[in-house]
Amino acid sequence: MSRINNAFYADLGDRWFEGDEHAVALLRAEAGIKVRYTLEVFERMGIGPGARVLDVACGAGLVAFPLAGRGYRVKGVDLAEGAIETARRQTPEGVDATFAVADAYATGEPAGAYDAVLLLDMLEHVERPADVLCEAARVARPGGAVVFHTFNRTPEAWLLAIHGMKVVARDTPEHVHVYELFIRPSELRAMAREAGLDVKEVRGVRPVVDRALWWSVVRRRVHPGFRFTFARVPRVGYAGYAVKG
């Protein structure tokens, strides 16, 4: 039986996009820096609009929609049927975004079909992240990108990503994160290497310490201005990307 609680994602409905008391509001706040970083990687690698992108564990499309709105052909997959139903219902007209229920360990997608694969805030939610990286490498084309975001296994990450989440979002389910499933950058690099991926960058990510954060702490609700920024050292979360050889 899995130690991590992934079941609640299927039942969020429109809370994916509304409300400030549930932990998913932090995912909404975090989506901005994920999209920003993904676009930076795409620009660096020459992956332009029209490229095919697979968003693994996409939820209700918090990252998929902004990318599709910029002209990327995005397919989102997630094991949570309710999240996929919400994503389909929320898909804006005129954007190339499709969604399907699929397992991150075996997506069912053709080998080498995607210019980029996104593993954003999901590797710490699975028991076998190495197998997810292997599947990402399988469906990425040679020279394609695998973009990731996850949490380091440090005391700071334990404090902020587990206990801090409960402080700023009063409606946080139990076991949203499990400390033992957090991944050190060195471990991720080793797993990626075994999967045939060359990690090119790891960059720290942390909350912005400002009035919005303290407002959230005091009221135990996520302020609309709650933001994340990059950090020199990946002591809490980190983003990065790898290239398929």
Question: Each predicted region: which residue ranges?
Answer:
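A short glycine-rich, Lys/Arg-flanked "PGG" loop and its adjoining helix->strand segment in the class I
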Residues: A130-P142
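N-terminal, positively charged/glycine-rich alpha-helical extensions of SAM-dependent methyltransferases
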Residues: M1-D20
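A C-terminal cap/extension of S-adenosyl-L-methionine-dependent methyltransferases
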Residues: G94, V168, A190, E194, ...
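Conserved alpha-helix/loop element of class I SAM-dependent methyltransferases that forms part
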Residues: R28-P49
